[in-house]
């Protein structure tokens, strides 16, 4: 199945059908498993709406909010707006390789590296078939600010209802039962990590 779908030639709906044959890592309520849930939800949106996830989100979220630079596959005339992606390697900081370049682990297994930005371009090698709900869209700080502003306004933007108030409330609630182990001071909402205790939540920083 793989772990990163944005550059795949296989559609998400096809992948989800294959996922359905796999055993569960845990059943609902047993444990927190960071996995493919958002990708599966994106495939469900496509199945129910009859649209690609990109078309559905553009019609219902991106365009109503005025998010003019948010895409699953960036048009060629805007390709230069993409940031160059770099990866930290044993030889220092290098431009991230393409999908087919891999790093071989000591045990002989191949681990896919960070992706370059080519997989987010319209008419890329993927054929623009895999609309990954979990990590497929790219945007700008300005566009994302419009989305966050809508959440802060309980689902409204300039007087227009984008999401229901209840949907926003559910997004930012911690849905993990207290007995399920997770990061100290944190919980998980609908697609977001939730800080439940500022005094416990923290980070040692990055290297």
Give the role of each language-model region.
Residues 1-202:
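Short, surface-exposed loop or secondary-structure junction motifs
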């Amino acid at each position: 199945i793989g772990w990163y779908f944005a550059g795949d030639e296989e559609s998400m709906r096809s992948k989800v059908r294959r996922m359905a044959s796999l055993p569960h890592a845990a059943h609902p309520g047993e444990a927190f498993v960071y996995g493919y849930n958002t990708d599966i939800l994106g495939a469900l949106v496509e199945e129910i709406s009859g649209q690609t996830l990109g078309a559905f989100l553009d019609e219902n979220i991106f365009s109503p909010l005025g998010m003019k630079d948010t895409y699953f596959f960036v048009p060629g005339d805007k390709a230069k707006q993409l940031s160059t992606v770099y990866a930290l390697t044993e030889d220092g900081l290098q431009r991230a390789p393409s999908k087919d370049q891999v790093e071989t682990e000591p045990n002989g297994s191949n681990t896919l590296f960070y992706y370059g930005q080519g997989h987010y371009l319209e008419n890329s090698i993927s054929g623009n078939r895999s609309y990954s709900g979990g990590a497929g869209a790219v945007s700008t700080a300005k566009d994302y600010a419009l989305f966050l502003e809508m959440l802060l306004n309980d689902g409204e933007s300039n007087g227009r209802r984008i999401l229901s108030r209840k949907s926003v409330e559910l997004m930012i609630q911690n849905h993990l039962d207290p007995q399920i182990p997770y990061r100290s001071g944190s919980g998980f909402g609908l697609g977001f990590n939730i800080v439940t205790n500022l005094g416990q939540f923290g980070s040692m920083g990055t290297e």
